[in-house]
Amino acid sequence: MNEFAQEIVDFDNKAKKIFFSLYEKFAESAKQLDRKKDDNVFQQQQGKYLNTLKTQLENLAQDLLNKYSSLKNINLLNKKLRDEINIYLNEFRQKSRAL
Protein backbone atom coordinates (compact mmCIF):
# COMPACT_ATOMS: atom_id res chain seq x y z
CA MET A 1 0.00 0.00 0.00
CA ASN A 2 1.09 3.54 -0.72
CA GLU A 3 2.80 5.21 2.23
CA PHE A 4 0.64 8.01 3.64
CA ALA A 5 -2.31 7.09 1.40
CA GLN A 6 -4.87 7.84 4.13
CA GLU A 7 -3.22 11.13 5.05
CA ILE A 8 -3.17 12.23 1.40
CA VAL A 9 -6.84 11.27 0.99
CA ASP A 10 -7.61 13.27 4.13
CA PHE A 11 -5.79 16.27 2.64
CA ASP A 12 -7.41 15.90 -0.80
CA ASN A 13 -10.95 15.68 0.57
CA LYS A 14 -10.54 19.02 2.31
CA ALA A 15 -8.35 20.61 -0.37
CA LYS A 16 -10.92 19.94 -3.11
CA LYS A 17 -13.54 21.91 -1.19
CA ILE A 18 -11.15 24.83 -0.79
CA PHE A 19 -10.10 24.64 -4.44
CA PHE A 20 -13.59 24.60 -5.92
CA SER A 21 -14.91 27.27 -3.57
CA LEU A 22 -12.11 29.68 -4.52
CA TYR A 23 -12.23 28.77 -8.20
CA GLU A 24 -15.97 29.46 -8.37
CA LYS A 25 -15.45 32.87 -6.74
CA PHE A 26 -12.61 33.65 -9.14
CA ALA A 27 -14.60 32.53 -12.20
CA GLU A 28 -17.52 34.71 -11.10
CA SER A 29 -15.30 37.77 -10.70
CA ALA A 30 -13.52 37.05 -14.01
CA LYS A 31 -16.85 36.89 -15.86
CA GLN A 32 -17.25 40.60 -15.32
CA LEU A 33 -13.98 41.39 -17.10
CA ASP A 34 -13.24 41.90 -20.77
CA ARG A 35 -10.06 39.84 -21.11
CA LYS A 36 -8.80 41.89 -24.05
CA LYS A 37 -9.13 45.22 -22.27
CA ASP A 38 -8.74 44.08 -18.68
CA ASP A 39 -6.09 41.37 -18.89
CA ASN A 40 -3.95 43.08 -16.26
CA VAL A 41 -6.91 43.12 -13.87
CA PHE A 42 -7.56 39.45 -14.69
CA GLN A 43 -3.92 38.63 -13.91
CA GLN A 44 -4.13 40.51 -10.61
CA GLN A 45 -7.33 38.70 -9.65
CA GLN A 46 -5.81 35.36 -10.60
CA GLY A 47 -2.74 36.12 -8.49
CA LYS A 48 -4.88 37.12 -5.53
CA TYR A 49 -6.91 33.91 -5.67
CA LEU A 50 -3.79 31.78 -6.26
CA ASN A 51 -2.15 33.28 -3.17
CA THR A 52 -5.29 32.67 -1.12
CA LEU A 53 -5.46 29.08 -2.37
CA LYS A 54 -1.78 28.51 -1.59
CA THR A 55 -2.13 29.95 1.93
CA GLN A 56 -5.24 27.93 2.73
CA LEU A 57 -3.73 24.70 1.40
CA GLU A 58 -0.50 25.30 3.31
CA ASN A 59 -2.51 25.88 6.49
CA LEU A 60 -4.44 22.66 5.85
CA ALA A 61 -1.19 20.77 5.28
CA GLN A 62 0.27 22.17 8.50
CA ASP A 63 -2.83 21.12 10.44
CA LEU A 64 -2.46 17.59 9.07
CA LEU A 65 1.27 17.51 9.82
CA ASN A 66 0.46 18.51 13.39
CA LYS A 67 -2.26 15.85 13.57
CA TYR A 68 0.07 13.14 12.29
CA SER A 69 3.23 14.42 13.98
CA SER A 70 3.92 11.08 15.66
CA LEU A 71 4.37 9.32 12.30
CA LYS A 72 7.77 8.18 11.19
CA ASN A 73 8.96 9.89 8.01
CA ILE A 74 6.96 13.03 8.73
CA ASN A 75 9.34 14.90 6.39
CA LEU A 76 8.26 12.62 3.55
CA LEU A 77 4.61 13.37 4.31
CA ASN A 78 5.48 17.07 4.27
CA LYS A 79 7.03 16.69 0.80
CA LYS A 80 4.02 14.74 -0.48
CA LEU A 81 1.66 17.43 0.81
CA ARG A 82 3.75 20.15 -0.85
CA ASP A 83 3.56 18.18 -4.11
CA GLU A 84 -0.23 18.01 -3.71
CA ILE A 85 -0.38 21.77 -3.13
CA ASN A 86 1.58 22.38 -6.33
CA ILE A 87 -0.82 20.14 -8.25
CA TYR A 88 -3.78 22.19 -7.02
CA LEU A 89 -2.04 25.47 -7.87
CA ASN A 90 -1.20 24.27 -11.38
CA GLU A 91 -4.77 23.06 -11.87
CA PHE A 92 -6.06 26.47 -10.82
CA ARG A 93 -3.75 28.18 -13.33
CA GLN A 94 -4.86 25.86 -16.14
CA LYS A 95 -8.56 26.25 -15.40
CA SER A 96 -8.10 30.03 -15.15
CA ARG A 97 -6.58 30.22 -18.61
CA ALA A 98 -9.66 28.51 -20.04
CA LEU A 99 -11.96 31.31 -18.84
Please report, for each region that a protein language model flagged, where it lies by residue.
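Short terminal alpha-helical segments
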Residues: M1-K37
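Intrinsically disordered, low-complexity regions enriched in small/polar residues
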Residues: Q6, N13, K25-E28, Q44, ...
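Generic structural signal for well-ordered, non-transmembrane alpha-helical segments
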Residues: V9, N13-K16, F20, G47, ...
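Long, hydrophobic, amphipathic alpha-helical segments used as structural scaffolds
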Residues: F19, Y23-F26, A30, D34, ...
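Acidic, low-complexity, intrinsically disordered interaction modules
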Residues: D39-K79
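Amphipathic alpha-helical binding modules
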Residues: S69-L99
